[in-house]
Amino acid sequence: MSLYWTMFGHPSEQDIDEIESWFDWPISVYDFPRFRDVNVNSENPIIKVTTRSGGGNREEYEENNEYVSLLEGFICDKDASWDSTYAIFKYKIPDRSLDKWREYIERKKLELKKSQQISTKKINEDDENNKDNIDNNSASTIVDEFMKAFTKIHENIETEKILQNTDKSFSNTREIEFKQPSQEQSQQQLSNECVVKITELLDKAKISINDLNKTIEKLNETVNKYHG
């Protein structure tokens, strides 16, 4: 396998057309016996055409193999080390086409570099998104959000109780007298709103069982703080 193949993979049809233009061949690489691939050496001005006419297939394709060995630039052919039924025909790029070969290799290197930069950027973005998700979904974040909401709910209830007590003190001239919510009603309201908030937060986050247990322990501590 050539360095080119390792670096750039298999050439496209457009690449193959460009490679063929370097030679004065009466046929296309697609006309090689059981053509499979063509690749360019990035260090030396050589191309290799891979076919399925090697090993035990050589007898059947002897005439075809002999014909392509007469093409311009032919160096040698041999069976592939990884599968002897494949044959590799090696050709030297003519001097008149060396500049085109160099330009081709440099262009492919730039394309590879750009592709790697895009891949690296995407990996970094994915890592950053994953980090944000982990941070947003952590148990500590859930607890912090809940405690803020819990405190706010509790403050609202206490404020409501104060306002209702104030209204009661000035209700002598009224026909309707406000009743202050009982302790049980306040706790029930607090519990209901807490359940809603917990559900919202847990739906928002995906946390592990261990994190959930830690969250529950922290919530218990918070509830005991207000109603211990």
Swiss-Prot record:
Keywords: Coiled coil. It comes from the Viruses. Residues 196-228 form a coiled coil. This is Uncharacterized protein L792. It comes from Acanthamoeba polyphaga mimivirus.
